[in-house]
């Protein structure tokens, strides 16, 4: 109930901040914090993973991922336990992958419709355009760009 009231992205941010504070990584994280301002629907869908406790545990584990392969391992685990992933869960896993790939390279990534702006650590800005303003096209364009960077 609480998560639906505050929204998944805010909840995730609060959870991530708490986990960082608990693990004393706060100083390191603040230096290279990535600000993702993407207008996409992405969350671990309660229709796929109905048990709150399991979903929260997956959010926690995903927030701790530092390498892309860790996200892929958890993705495989979710598929094994709950079946084929829905679009929102796939997009959430893409967001986690984007955070990992962009960390220590970019300050922020944002979008307005299909226009995507990357702001590097040196404040240099770069604009790219996704095929469309669909969430999956935006995420695909960002991932493709980050893998080239």
PLM features per residue range, with description:
Residues 1-149:
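Accessory helical-bundle/CTD segments and flexible terminal tails appended to RecA-like ATPase motors
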């Amino acid at each position: 109930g609480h998560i639906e009231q505050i929204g998944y992205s805010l909840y995730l941010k609060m959870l991530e901040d708490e986990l960082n504070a608990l693990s004393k990584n706060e100083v390191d994280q603040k230096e290279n914090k990535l600000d993702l301002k993407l207008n996409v629907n992405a969350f671990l869908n309660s229709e796929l993973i109905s048990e709150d406790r399991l979903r929260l545990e997956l959010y926690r584990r995903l927030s701790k991922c530092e390498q892309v392969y860790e996200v892929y391992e958890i993705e495989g685990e979710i598929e094994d336990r709950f079946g084929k992933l829905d679009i929102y869960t796939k997009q959430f896993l893409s967001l986690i992958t984007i955070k990992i790939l962009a960390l220590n390279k970019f300050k922020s990534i944002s979008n307005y419709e299909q226009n995507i702006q990357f702001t590097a650590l040196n404040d240099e800005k770069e604009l790219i355009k996704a095929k469309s303003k669909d969430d999956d096209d935006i995420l695909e364009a960002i991932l493709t760009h980050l893998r080239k960077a």
